[in-house]
């Protein structure tokens, strides 16, 4: 694609992303700020899901695989935090940095081994997407602790999962945005870089 086409694609991506943010902030973001994390929202999780899917080509046929992998990644992230919390709460590993290092090393080994081998053909084994979701789960939980305090079931103060459903919605939104960004190529002539109607 020539420079004109790339510029037009950049315009498409920017406009679509702006529309997404506007819709998100007036719906999910407003709900989050009013009901989940008072005065806050987490639209920025979108921009973890989007680039991971987008740089992999954002193929239509991979859309569900990425959605499922992000959602499972959040579950993995919750498991990491739950184990860290239990180890801290029971006094087994009291140093938080050692706790995090040990749990990440062990659980990551199990996670990768499973998804690289016996689960590799299933539609939730895109490990980079899982890692992105795990990272988001960690900061989302920490942010929730900072705003609301540790979760009611946390015995070591390591987690608060209050905003996790919103995080899941946002990661799915980011995946959809990645698909829409890539679909913009259908409206650009690959040779001339001009706008066109798909199929013509």
What residue spans do the PLM features occupy?
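N-terminal topogenic module of multi-pass integral membrane proteins
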Residues: 1-47, 51
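Membrane-helix interfacial "entry" motifs
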Residues: 1-6, 54, 58-66, 92, ...
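Hydrophobic, lipid-facing residues on alpha-helical transmembrane segments of integral membrane proteins
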Residues: 7, 11-23, 27, 63-83, ...
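Helix-coil boundary and interhelical linker segments in multi-pass alpha-helical membrane proteins
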Residues: 27-34, 82-94, 156-163
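Pore- and pathway-forming membrane helices of multi-pass small-molecule/ion transporters and channels
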Residues: 31-57, 105-153
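Membrane-interface starts of transmembrane alpha-helices
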Residues: 35-42, 91-103, 162-166
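Short, highly charged, low-complexity non-transmembrane loops/tails of multi-pass membrane proteins
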Residues: 188-200
């Amino acid at each position: 694609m020539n420079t004109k086409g790339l510029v037009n694609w950049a315009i498409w991506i920017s406009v679509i992303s702006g529309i997404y943010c506007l819709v998100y902030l007036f719906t999910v973001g407003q709900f989050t700020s009013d009901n989940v994390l008072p005065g806050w929202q987490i639209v920025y999780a979108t921009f973890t899901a989007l680039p991971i899917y987008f740089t992999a080509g954002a193929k239509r046929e991979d859309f569900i695989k990425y959605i499922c992998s992000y959602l499972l990644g959040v579950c993995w992230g919750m498991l990491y935090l739950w184990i860290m919390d239990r180890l801290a709460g029971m006094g087994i590993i009291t140093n938080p940095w050692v706790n995090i290092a040990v749990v990440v090393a062990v659980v990551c080994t199990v996670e990768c081994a499973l998804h690289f081998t016996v689960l590799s053909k299933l539609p939730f084994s895109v490990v980079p997407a899982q890692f992105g979701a795990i990272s988001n789960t960690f900061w989302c939980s920490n942010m929730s602790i900072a705003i609301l305090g540790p979760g009611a079931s946390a015995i070591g103060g390591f987690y608060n999962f209050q905003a996790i459903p919103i995080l899941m919605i946002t990661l799915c939104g980011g995946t959809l945005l990645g698909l829409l960004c890539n679909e913009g190529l259908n409206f650009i002539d690959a040779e001339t870089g001009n706008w066109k109607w798909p199929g013509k």
